[in-house]
Amino acid sequence: MGINDVDINKVTPMMRQYIEIKQKNKDIIIFFRLGDFYEMFFEDAVNVSRELELTLTGKSCGLEERVPMCGIPHHAANIYIDKLIEKGYKVGICEQLEDPALAKGIVERDLIQIVSPGTIISQESLVDWDNNYIGNIIDLDYAYGVSYTDISTGEIKAFITDKNNNKVVSQILSIGIKEIVADSKVATEIIGLLKNQYKIVVTITDQINDYDYYDYIFKDLKDMRYKRIVNHLLTYITNTQKRFLNHFQTLKTIELDEHMKMDVHTKRNLELTETLRLKQRNYSLIWLLDKTKTAPGARLLKTFIENPEIKMEVINKRLDIVSTLMKEFILKNDLIDSLNEVYDLERLAGRVAFGSANARDLLQIKNSLKILPNIQKILEKINFYYKIETLPELYELLENSIYEEPPVSIKEGFLIKSGYNAELDELKDLRKGGKDFVARFENEERERTGLKTLKVGYNRVFGYFIEVSKGSVNLVKEEFGYERRQTLANAERYISPILKEKEALILNAEEKIIDLEYNLFVEIRENVKTYISRIQKIAKVLSEIDVLQSFATVAETNNFVRPELTLERDIEVIDGRHPVVEKVINREYVANDVKMNTDTDILLITGPNMAGKSTYMRELAIIVIMAQIGSFVPATKAKLPIFDAIFTRIGASDDLVSGESTFMVEMLEANNAIMNATKNSLILFDELGRGTATFDGMSLAQAIIEYIHNNIGAKTLFSTHYHELTDLENKLKHLKNVHVSALEENGKITFLHKIKDGSVDKSYGIHVASLANLPKELIARANEILNIYEKKEKRIDTKVQECLPLNFEVKDNKAIEHLKQIDPNSLTPIAALNILYELKEEVKR
């Protein structure tokens, strides 16, 4: 039975309430609170029971047949919500808004929050070391506006980007946004890519409210376009969270060229935050560098790695602090010990703003504040460029009010210390007196009645009672004044007038204590809410010093050196190492130099398979990134320019989802570098052209090398198996040949992993195949065929074109006119292919 098949006038009041809420939120799974359970009905029940492997049952609701139903305990809701979110669902939490015992008629219920991939705030559901971003895109007619926030921390950023579909998708992927809100004008190709290829939850809405409540976010904002962009996102968040949130920080607008540019492919190829194959954090660069002690520090480290600095003064300020911490190791160790005592202040502030912080959260804030004076002294001694507040008045409030070991729930009492509130103290004295009476009454009754097994107990059904064992029941006399209440297998339970009188006083005090403690706690939490922006500033400073102590710790452990950043374009890395590879291999790492002066823009790298060409290329990129985030680097000396971007084409894997072949992916990534690189960029091309036929691939590789050499001038590492290309050293004055050396003895090959000047003319592919234990007869046959090919081989002319402008002459005017009328930004891949075939036919005619 589906919800649309039901006559709402025939169902019970409770089910009518559910249906009315569900019909307003059709695309959301409703968790409907009934007592100690969340229950789901109709299609929601069917879907949830299937996805979570729950028992599907039925519920009577006034109809002839029971409606589908499943349920979960309310205290375990986060576990089930997380599983549904991972599967791409949104979950609406429908709570009871009044005490069922006090309700007149049907209990009032309503949605209090909609949970989606980008709006998770529960501590158990979030990863400490990663942000959980929700973002939006709006069409500004001439450009796209993008903003994003982590509602668990309150940071909020925005940028305006070209109206290029692939570019904006790449930027969203690079940031790691988990959920997108888009207006209806955003290109369907963008929506399709995000939803279908990258499995990002997308909501289409044009609603934009200009809330006065959020005006503080736009303080000192000069470009008011950003207000519209961000308000689109804030409207969605406010609507789904059913409240205003005061922990959003002042908007940070981003210029896309204010940090080193790296697209999502470059970040993946270099394994900055996860490995290529297993998508794991272990054995990535962040795994090596992360010795942070706080969750905000770990998240900031990830931000640093993905957005290296290009301002020399910022980089050198960080390097100065790292140097100081390495010299002042006692201070550094004291700092590390202190940071270990600091909790996740960013997300604690977020939970306070959300109204979901419990007493344990406030206790974590208090314990973090306690350590701040010591951290402030350390920061002063190392001349750190930021200061922190210590908020002694907030610490005093929490120290005087919150129990040291409070329960998780804020509705069970035992939250507030004695001495904080006079009325509460009076009630606690009354409760204590009542409990003392119970103990005294039990002893007196034993003495009075002679019943040695008599006990006084309590449960929620009968309240306080007198319990007498079965063996002594016959000794209970009428003059005792006991009234029988319950018969058990081994005992009888009674009440007495005196006990019931005291019970009323005790339970009344207990109930009042719980209510008063809850109200006092909420009052304290509201007070803490006024400190949110100051707590966030403290967290920001602590996160940065935490990252820098992590850099110092890693540098000491791994023998890293301070890089020298210059305004020149020379690269001089002596004994460079790939820090992650060095950490995980079971042998001594072979260090290599990278020297590229003003006369050398391109290193053409040849050498055997598996000899280390790719590692050498990645090594330089990793050293550059580490230097520009303010870290020491794995080398004995490193003199580097400031790079504005890194472009890579490393590895070859078909993009099966989008239907793009290895070669197409190669060409797209090469084109990205060619169109966007400057002379201050770093380009890494590994085996470019291998995805197509040999002559095609070699021709393209040479043309690309020439174009970079003549038109861009970027520092480039280009590895190849096309040994014919090594002739280019004699024809391109800024290109230099280097090779990875190997030792060949008695038909066996030993990889030396050492980079040397000059070229090699062998790839040793068959040797590598033998190392992979291919059958010996197969290896022998391959050697025979190789000898045949080597005898037939003719040297290919690598005549250089002086300059390769990216234009061409087409005589067919119809094709040109057709091209002029095409808007590439509005084309889907299929439409583009169709037009390509049409153009081909026109040229043929």
PLM region descriptions:
Residues 8, 42-45, 223, 293, ...:
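ATPase nucleotide-binding head domains, primarily ABC-like/P-loop NTPase cores
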Residues 28-31, 37, 88-92, 179, ...:
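Beta-sheet entry/capping signal
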Residues 358, 838-842:
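Short, small/acidic-rich helices and loops at N termini and domain boundaries
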Residues 207-213, 261, 276, 367-436, ...:
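Amphipathic heptad-repeat alpha-helical coiled-coil/stalk segments that mediate oligomerization
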Residues 488, 492-526:
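Extended, charged coiled-coil "arm/hinge" scaffolds of SMC/Rad50-like chromosome-maintenance ATPases
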Residues 1-324, 333, 337-340, 344-353, ...:
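Charged catalytic and DNA/RNA-contacting regions of genome-maintenance
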Residues 344, 354, 358, 368-371, ...:
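Charged, surface-exposed helical/loop "interaction arms" that form contiguous linear patches used
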Residues 25-26, 85-87, 129, 140-142, ...:
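Short flexible coil/turn linkers enriched for glycine and charged/polar residues
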